[in-house]
C-alpha cells in the first residue's frame, strides 16, 4: 500500500492503517513549504508523522512525479486523503484495487478543496465522509461507502475537521478489509444531480459585511475558523471575530451600528444582530469581547466596519 496525504486531516487514517497492520510501503505528501513569520521551510503534518512511524516519505512536486514513485512500488492499493495533487489517469490504473479516497463531504455535494467550510457556510444540517475510487475527474469517482453526521450549531471548521478525520478513517477500514479478502464491493456512481463545488478558501472572503443577515455572518465566523478568519474593525482596531451568536433586533438601526456593549457587544446586521463573544486583535490572543472593550471602549450608537 501507498498512502498519499498532507494535512492534519489525513493523520487519523494513516495511524489507523498502521495500527491495523497494513504494509505501507511509502507515504506521498506535499513538499516542505515556507510557513510562519520566518517563512521557514516546514514539512507537512503527514510527513512529520510518517517519519516518526518509520515510513519512507516521498515529496514529488507534481502528479507525474507521484506516478514515478507509485509505478516503482507497484502497490495493491493507494489510499489518498487530502493529498493536494491531482493524480494522472496513468497512475490511477497502476494499483490492482485502484486509488481510494476519503473525501470530507457526502458526495456529490461539495466536491473540491474546501468541503467542510462550505458546508458550514451554507448552513447544511449534515455532512459526512465518502470513500470513493478516484477517476480522472475532480471528486467524481464511484462511491464505495458513506457516513453522515449532523453539524453542531456551534461547530467550527476546525472542530468538524477533526471529527470527520476520525470518521473517515473508521469508514475506510471495512472497505479495505473487503478488498483484501477478495469480497466484492458495490461501487455506486455519483448522482447526476446535487453536485456542488467547494471552491478553495480565499483570504479576502474573511472580511465581514454587516449588511448581510446575522445568521449568515455567524456561519461565516464558524466556517472560516481557523482560516482565513472573519475580520472587522471595532473601536478602530482591526480584529478577528472568534465567536458570535445571533440575537433578535426588531428595531435595529443601520447595519454595523453598536446596539449594546453590556452585557454583550451586540452589533446590528442586515437582518437581526450579532452578539460578538470572542475577539482577537493583531499580535494578541483571542479574548472575551468584554475584556477587549475594557481596553478599547465603545458606546451604543457607534459604528463598526
Predicted regions and their residues:
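One-carbon transfer enzymes
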Residues: 1-226, 281-283, 302-305
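An anion-binding loop in the catalytic cleft
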Residues: 211-305
Amino acid at each position: 500500500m501507498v498512502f498519499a496525504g498532507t494535512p492534519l486531516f489525513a493523520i487519523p487514517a494513516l495511524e489507523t492503517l498502521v495500527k491495523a497492520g497494513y504494509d505501507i510501503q511509502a507515504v506521498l505528501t506535499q513538499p516542505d513549504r515556507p510557513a510562519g513569520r520566518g517563512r521557514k521551510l516546514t514539512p507537512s503534518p503527514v510527513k512529520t508523522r510518517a517519519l516518526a512511524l518509520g515510513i519512507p516519505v516521498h515529496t514529488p512536486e507534481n502528479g507525474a512525479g507521484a506516478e514515478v514513485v507509485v509505478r516503482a512500488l507497484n502497490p495493491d492499493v493507494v489510499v489518498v486523503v487530502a493529498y493536494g495533487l491531482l493524480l494522472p489517469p496513468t497512475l490511477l490504473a497502476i494499483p490492482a484495487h485502484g486509488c481510494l479516497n476519503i473525501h470530507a463531504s457526502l458526495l456529490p455535494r461539495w466536491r473540491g478543496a474546501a468541503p467542510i467550510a462550505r458546508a458550514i457556510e451554507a448552513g447544511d444540517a449534515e455532512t459526512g465522509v465518502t470513500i470513493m475510487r478516484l477517476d480522472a475527474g475532480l471528486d467524481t469517482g464511484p462511491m464505495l461507502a458513506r457516513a453522515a453526521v449532523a453539524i453542531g450549531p456551534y461547530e467550527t471548521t476546525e472542530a468538524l475537521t477533526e471529527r470527520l478525520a476520525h470518521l473517515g478513517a473508521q469508514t475506510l477500514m471495512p472497505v479495505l478489509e473487503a478488498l483484501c479478502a477478495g469480497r466484492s464491493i458495490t461501487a455506486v456512481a455519483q448522482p447526476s444531480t446535487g453536485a456542488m463545488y467547494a471552491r478553495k478558501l480565499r483570504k479576502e472572503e474573511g472580511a465581514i459585511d454587516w449588511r448581510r443577515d446575522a445568521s449568515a455572518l455567524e456561519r461565516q465566523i464558524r466556517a472560516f475558523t481557523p482560516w482565513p478568519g472573519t475580520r472587522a474593525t471595532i473601536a478602530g482596531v482591526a480584529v478577528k471575530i472568534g465567536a458570535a451568536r445571533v440575537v433578535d433586533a426588531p428595531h435595529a438601526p443601520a447595519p454595523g451600528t453598536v446596539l449594546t456593549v453590556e452585557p454583550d457587544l451586540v452589533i446590528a446586521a442586515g437582518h437581526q444582530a450579532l452578539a460578538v463573544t470572542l475577539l482577537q486583535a493583531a499580535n494578541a490572543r483571542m479574548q472575551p469581547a468584554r475584556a477587549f472593550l475594557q481596553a478599547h471602549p465603545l458606546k451604543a450608537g457607534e459604528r463598526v466596519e
